[in-house]
């Protein structure tokens, strides 16, 4: 059953069209030059990154990938400086995590009818740039395929609050809490207008638990949070794409360590080549380009044995789903 859309009140909070169009034009104008001369890696930063092992995990989680939609984008805008006419397939997915003490979702991504229910909240021309291909598998149907109902979910952890990581909340009970850093909530929900990639409708009426990253450095990341105190679910700081972007490092019951990196990158190609997104779309959707590039360096320096899954990396998401 399709619910009504998130309403005119939330659409009124979107950024006006003219400023968005001006940002798009500026980003487009900057893109050709960065195709020829991509941003150089910070070799000093790489040389000074310390790699600290994560704590030993005394518990493990079961992980299920819920692929909901796909889309495609030119490879040359996903990783600037890559001179290719090819398109890269991108995924949109939620991730079900079952811990001995809780069942939760990383990135409750999409609801059924997201094109009509959520995308109208975004300023023009953003919906034209980000809309997934149809059909879209709604979150409740994706969960039902694994015999799980929305009422079975204890809480959700969005890697950040862009629309395509939280729209599935419209299909979860209002009692399901959102856990995330307070700085992310303040950025997305403060002020008269939502940031360009944020739709506030799915977030309205929700309980938020502000989880601060007050734990020690882990791997190449400066701050962490051991969610259950057993090393199985660690939140790490991936600020840049948004002010409160986080990664979720899991100790999975197949023996692997999986890091969900949200939109810190859209593809592992960026990590391998140390490339940020092209100015279009990076200048439109990355809140702090310098911080985002620093985060890519931290991902590049990860040790072997960490499986990196960016939310839109179709190859990585599909490979994890097959395990």
Model-derived segments and spans:
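C-terminal/domain-terminus segments
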Residues: 81-82, 179-180, 189-207, 269-272, ...
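Active-site metal-binding loops of divalent metal-dependent hydrolases
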Residues: 69, 108-111, 161, 184, ...
